[in-house]
Design a protein with these regions (language model features):
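Intracellular alpha-helical coupling/juxtamembrane segments of multi-pass membrane proteins
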Residues: 240-273, 277-283, 287-294
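Flexible loop/N-cap segments at domain edges
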Residues: 297-301
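ABC ATP-binding cassette signature C-motif
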Residues: 3-252
Length: 301
């Protein structure tokens, strides 16, 4: 019992010390269960790729981690520092030029940078922010954006690039939802290099397998409401996933066999029912409940 208590205490302490963690999180959207008592721990330095079939809840999980959504139950522990976030949907309320919107994430410094870009450069000279100005402009240019373009006039794909630029400038800790969408190969290569050099902690969703293979140091799969961790790169993930599913199928087969045996036993004649073991009956009820709660595998990732 003492050993179990120490193990549970260590698990709680580990989550508290993690950069970002979830404990027992449940999320239902429109009556659809996406997460069921899910746990996750993200350490500083992780580059974590979230995978799962369409509709499994990957974008919702990113929104939970970033604070845009709240769970139905459970706890999410976030860092006190800023996290640069690229959501799936660009906010409709953004207004201004591309440069001003990207620099905006830097707070007062960003306002000074935007003023400098507009020609009132005295604030930046006072704060010594020309190097930061160059960083903002470089990201904007590498993403193929016009810094002086009005945001409301841009296409949907170009607006997503603005959202990506904001995230990259905001923080070295990043949550990115499909960051390579609407990017050409050269820009994707630049983004990969930038993230490898600049990102401290990265959580991302991407259907670009080459991008995931180059960046991911961990893979977490969203599958039937649970989160499955694979401590490997994306290249080894398919093999590890097949191993997990095979083990799961074996466990389910044993459970189904046991359930069938117990159902046959409970249906025996009147004499057997009179002498049946009540503990065995309770175990059968529990088996039925476990089988009813099981969410069968649906499609491929």
């Amino acid at each position: 019992m003492a050993a179990r208590h120490r193990a549970e205490s260590y698990h709680v302490l580990e989550n508290i010390l993690a950069f970002l963690s979830m404990q027992g999180v449940t999320l239902n959207l429109g009556g659809k269960p996406l997460l069921d008592s899910a746990d996750l721990s993200v350490e500083i330095g992780d580059r974590l790729c979230l995978v799962g079939r369409n509709g499994a809840g990957k974008s919702s999980l990113l929104a939970l981690l970033g604070g845009q959504m709240q769970p139905n139950s459970g706890m999410i522990i976030r860092p006190g520092t800023l996290i640069g976030q690229m959501p799936q949907d660009v906010p409709e309320h953004w207004r201004g030029t591309v440069f001003s919107l990207v620099a905006e994430v830097l707070g007062e410094e960003g306002k000074a940078l935007a003023a400098a870009h507009a020609g009132a450069d005295h604030g930046v000279e006072i704060t010594g922010g020309w190097e930061r100005y160059g960083d903002v402009l470089a990201v904007i240019n590498h993403l193929g954006l016009n810094p002086d373009a009005d945001f409301t006039s841009l296409s949907g794909g170009t607006k997503r690039r603005v959202a990506l630029a904001r995230a990259l400038i905001c923080s070295e800790d990043l949550i990115l939802d499909e960051p390579t969408n609407h990017l050409d190969i050269a820009t994707i290569t630049w983004l990969e290099d930038f993230l490898l050099r600049k990102a401290r902690t990265l959580i991302f969703v991407s259907h670009d397998r080459a991008f995931a293979k180059r960046l991911a140091t961990r893979v977490v799969e969203v599958d039937r409401g649970k989160l499955h961790n694979y401590s490997c790169g994306f290249d080894r993930y398919p093999e590890r996933r097949e191993e997990r599913l095979a083990a799961e199928e074996r466990a389910f087969a044993l459970q189904d066999k046991k359930l069938a045996q117990e159902e046959a036993w409970i249906r025996q004649g009147i004499k057997a029912r009179r002498t049946r073991n009540m503990g065995r009956v309770r175990a059968l009820v529990a088996l039925r409940a476990e089988r009813a709660a099981r969410r069968d595998k649906q499609g491929n990732v």
